[in-house]
A protein has these predicted regions:
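Aromatic-glycine hotspot motif
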Residues: 1-47, 52-154
Length: 154
């Protein structure tokens, strides 16, 4: 494993295996779905957003391979109509996602993304990360593949 991969895993492992994993053990489904303040997102939304950004970021932008989301009908398993990362969602959409998301499906999706992330990071070195991304490819992923809603993409 390269030094950059080792450093990443030193940070990623406690985040995923302690902090994020702990939420599933101590936070109730009702707590996962509620918003602590009208302008804050639910834990379920935050977990989904983290997984979506990680999935798209590493799989599409770093490795230029299909996302985990597309490997096993994850939108169906999570009971969601969205494939974007949610950054441009309205408060009403955040409420809808928080209410309808299948939490077991979300948990399994996050675990699948984390497994893929570990496999990717084990292969990374500085040459992979130094490769520039073509504007057309970024446009394809962001707009055509639906990572960001068209009205939010400019």
């Amino acid at each position: 494993m390269s030094p950059i991969s080792t450093l990443f895993m030193h940070r990623y492992t406690p985040l995923t295996e302690f902090y994020l994993a702990g939420f599933w053990q101590v936070v109730t489904p009702d707590q996962m779905r509620q918003r602590p303040h009208p302008r804050l997102n639910s834990i379920a939304w935050v977990m989904w957003h983290i997984a979506r950004v990680e999935d798209a970021g590493l799989n599409r932008f770093v490795m230029q391979q299909p996302q985990v989301l597309d490997s096993a009908d994850w939108t169906v398993q999570m009971n969601l109509p969205w494939r974007n990362h949610g950054g441009e969602m309205t408060l009403a959409e955040v409420d809808e996602l928080s209410a309808r998301i299948d939490l077991d499906g979300l948990h399994r999706y996050m675990q699948a993304v984390q497994t893929r992330t570990r496999a990717i990071v084990a292969t990374l070195d500085e040459t992979v990360l130094a490769q520039p991304l073509e504007h057309a490819f970024v446009q394809q992923v962001v707009v055509d593949e639906g990572l960001v809603l068209r009205n939010a993409a400019g």
